[in-house]
Amino acid sequence: MIQAQTMLKVADNSGAKEIMCVRVLGGSKRKWGNIGDIIVASVKSATPGGVVKKGEVVKAVVVRSAKGLRRADGSYIKFDENAAVLIKDDKQPRGTRIFGPVARELRDKDFNKILSLAPEVL
């Protein structure tokens, strides 16, 4: 579960290393997000010379969640960390590489470019 103030690792090479969730998009009463949800976040740490800078407000899609996600067959998929990929307004990733595995549930939400860049889809 991702909510406001949650710190997430950035799983791409956009220049940000860590972001903090400001808002989960999808309605005024929405409190939590999970894998495949779009969030608004603030960059808390970044690498020098990257595309994004510290303090910048960005949109991101959650690709890994420690809470886990229940699949249709009854199984659960969960990860060791919370991670996100920074995206543009047209749902395309800002970076050119994705690090670590991502869940296949992103395909249902039309993040096919992220799936094609990922080294492993679980």
From Swiss-Prot:
Keywords per UniProt: Ribonucleoprotein, Ribosomal protein, RNA-binding, rRNA-binding
Keyword Ribosomal protein: yes
GO cellular component, one term: cytosolic large ribosomal subunit
InterPro entries attached to this UniProt entry: Ribosomal_uL14, Ribosomal_uL14_bac-type, Ribosomal_uL14_CS, Ribosomal_uL14_sf
Function statement: Binds to 23S rRNA. Forms part of two intersubunit bridges in the 70S ribosome.
Assembly information from the UniProt record: Part of the 50S ribosomal subunit. Forms a cluster with proteins L3 and L19. In the 70S ribosome, L14 and L19 interact and together make contacts with the 16S rRNA in bridges B5 and B8.
PANTHER family reported for this sequence: 50S/60S RIBOSOMAL PROTEIN L14/L23, LARGE RIBOSOMAL SUBUNIT PROTEIN UL14M
Name assigned to this protein: Large ribosomal subunit protein uL14
Native species: Clostridium acetobutylicum (strain ATCC 824 / DSM 792 / JCM 1419 / IAM 19013 / LMG 5710 / NBRC 13948 / NRRL B-527 / VKM B-1787 / 2291 / W)
Gene: rplN
